[in-house]
Swiss-Prot record:
The keyword Metal-binding does not apply. It comes from Scolopendra dehaani. It is found in: Secreted. Keywords: Cleavage on pair of basic residues, Disulfide bond, Secreted, Signal, Toxin. This is Kappa-scoloptoxin(04)-Ssd1b. Expressed by the venom gland. Belongs to the scoloptoxin-04 family. Disulfide bonds join 44-55, 49-62. Residues 25-36 form a propeptide. One of its GO terms (molecular function) is toxin activity. GO terms for cellular component: extracellular region. It comes from the Eukaryota.
């Protein structure tokens, strides 16, 4: 019984994944990384800002942008 439930849940998840792929809703690892970078908040005093970010002097936090 327990094995049947586990297999059923696995099959449902597998079907949902194929549905997402057919609808073009696949979330690639690159999209996940991009979303995390959007929320990147680093202190300029402690760390240099990564490429593509500048230090906001008022808040002392890195923000997307260029000089």
């Amino acid at each position: 019984m327990k094995k049947t439930c586990v297999v059923s849940v696995f099959l449902v998840l597998l079907l949902l994944k194929f549905h997402d792929l057919s609808m073009g809703e696949e979330i690639s690892p690159l999209k996940k990384v991009a979303r995390r970078e959007d929320n990147l908040v680093l202190s300029c005093a402690e760390f240099p800002c990564p490429e593509g970010y500048i230090c906001d002097t008022a808040s002392q936090k890195c923000r997307p942008g260029t000089d």
